[in-house]
């Protein structure tokens, strides 16, 4: 079976909508990783999610004033039916790359500054820009457990997704204070939640819709560490028998991993997945980043 790194390289060279999963081997009784369509993911809830129509990406647009330069923006495709404003970009893709920017203040003085991220498609075109909205005291006193508001904006600076994380104890031995993040799209309108599920050994989360109904599961390793390699978190069906996607923390090199918080992530999901659930998976990725990969000052 191909390694995740080879799959990531293969998928990054394919056009949107062509995700490659490991083929099912004869005699294999483990989890299935085949793309089985959106109906396999939400048994009995197909009416809650609309399958977006197919489309093609266009020519990259120019960089907008006041935003990071050097990377073209993905052009906006036609919005699907009942699509929240700004989420139409997600209807055309099956992979997202998230790159955290290096903050000079953190490198030189070990002060925790506001995290900022670039969110790109598999072609390297920027889709969104994400910025943490917290104050200095909260960042440096609460560390990785801090509450935050993460504002995700499009190419014209319009806030299209808001992530809200409340203050919770970041201790795996305390099942009464499990982590949670709320995803809003547009701001003020919840579209889903990601909640930590207590387990004595493994890292587990549950993806919920706007009604707080369980939709998908996320399972990670027993020990979450990216000291020498990447880390994968599998997105599965509720019975954890079908793998429908993956959140991966990519190895960024020794110096970057040792001296900065600038992490790189990849998210894979079916192209025909509802855009709201794709936005919720983005929220799950940021929650995982803050919980496990923020350095303790």
Curated annotation (Swiss-Prot):
This is Phospholipid scramblase 2. Its cofactor is Ca(2+). The keyword Hydrolase does not apply. InterPro entries: Scramblase (IPR005552). Residues 294-297 are extracellular. It catalyses: a 1,2-diacyl-sn-glycero-3-phosphocholine(in) = a 1,2-diacyl-sn-glycero-3-phosphocholine(out). The N-terminal proline-rich domain (PRD) is required for phospholipid scramblase activity. One of its GO terms (biological process) is plasma membrane phospholipid scrambling. The chain crosses the membrane at residues 277-293. The modification Phosphothreonine is found at residue 149. GO terms for cellular component: endoplasmic reticulum; intracellular membrane-bounded organelle; nucleoplasm; nucleus; plasma membrane. Expression of isoform 1 seems restricted to testis.
């Amino acid at each position: 079976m191909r390694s995740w790194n080879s799959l990531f390289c293969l998928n990054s060279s394919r056009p949107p909508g062509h995700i490659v999963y490991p083929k099912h081997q004869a005699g294999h009784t483990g989890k299935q990783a085949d793309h089985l369509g959106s109906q396999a993911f939400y048994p009995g809830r197909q009416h809650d999610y609309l399958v977006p129509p197919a489309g093609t990406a266009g020519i990259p647009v120019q960089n907008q004033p006041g935003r990071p330069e050097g990377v073209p923006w993905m052009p906006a495709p036609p919005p699907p039916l009942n699509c929240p404003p700004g989420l139409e970009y997600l209807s055309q893709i099956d992979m997202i790359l998230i790159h955290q920017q290096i903050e000079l203040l953190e490198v030189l003085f070990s002060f925790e500054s506001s995290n900022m991220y670039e969110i790109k498609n598999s072609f390297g075109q920027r889709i969104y820009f994400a910025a943490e909205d917290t104050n200095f005291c909260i960042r440096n006193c609460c560390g990785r457990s801090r509450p935050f508001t993460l504002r995700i904006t499009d190419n014209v600076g319009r806030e299209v997704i808001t992530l809200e994380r409340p203050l919770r104890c970041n201790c795996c031995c305390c099942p009464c204070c499990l982590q949670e993040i709320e995803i809003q799209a547009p701001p003020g309108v919840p579209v889903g939640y990601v909640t930590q599920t207590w387990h004595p050994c493994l890292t587990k989360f549950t993806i919920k819709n706007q009604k707080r109904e369980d939709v998908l599961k996320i399972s990670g390793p027993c020990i979450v560490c990216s000291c020498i390699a990447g880390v994968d978190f599998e997105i599965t069906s509720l019975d954890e028998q079908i793998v429908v996607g993956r959140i991966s923390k990519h190895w960024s090199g020794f110096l970057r991993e040792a001296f900065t918080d600038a992490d790189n992530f990849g998210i894979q999901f079916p192209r025909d997945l509802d855009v709201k659930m794709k936005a919720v998976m983005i929220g799950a990725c940021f929650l995982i980043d803050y919980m496990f990969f923020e350095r303790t000052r």
